[in-house]
Amino acid sequence: MGEHENEGTLILDATCAPQNIRFPTDVSLLNEARLNTEEIIDELHGIGAFGSKKPRTYRQVAKNQYNSFSKSRKKSKKMIRKAMRQQLGYLRRNLKMIHATDKKLREELSAKLQERLSVVEVLYAQQKEMFEKGTHRIDERIVSLSQPWVRPIVRGKQNAPVEFGAKVEMSVVNSYLRIEDLRWDAFSEDTTLQTSVESYRRCFGHYPAHVLADTIFRTRENLRYCKEHDIHISGPRLGKRPADLSVYHEQLREE
């Protein structure tokens, strides 16, 4: 325990701060990446990277195919796979042409295009792997080319099972809100409880008497920690609910 008697209540909760990005789909991301590579090819051609003849990119064909797909109201899995295969093919061809140029000439690209090229390369590798494996999950998945640090955060809500933005853990003490943790990658809230409590102690000179938090915070390690510091943490006991529901409801009332 701390030097002083525990006082106050610490409320903990986590949420996602939605980022202002277009809802990502595999086909739309690949189409945007293709457009980016076409812009890069145009700039490289302007500085003589391909000689006098500009290479063919089939951009009009690729554009027509994407527009035809995007205008379809009902997109079957077969249609999505076909559109992805098409855009992956054009993107692969464009990247191959870009990397066939002199590296010194590529370094003459604007800083913005050089940065975008590196993001497009990662996106292509991710999308190719997911397409070949028939999955929609991959580590560090890019969902926005302009904001490549944004990650999908699984929330499990009925209307928004996945959100895109920073995950934020917050605390409330005496009606004041404080950000305890903010990350662009998904993290489990239970790992932040102890650091939040210790932050409370440094701020107020003592531990809180109560911690109010969702069930996810009530891990065995966190319960042990709270017991060790004489902190009451809200919520039902771990384990299976009692067969007698009246006992379970009594536990909730006590909390």
Positions of PLM-derived features:
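Anion-binding and metal-coordination hotspots
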Residues: 1-255
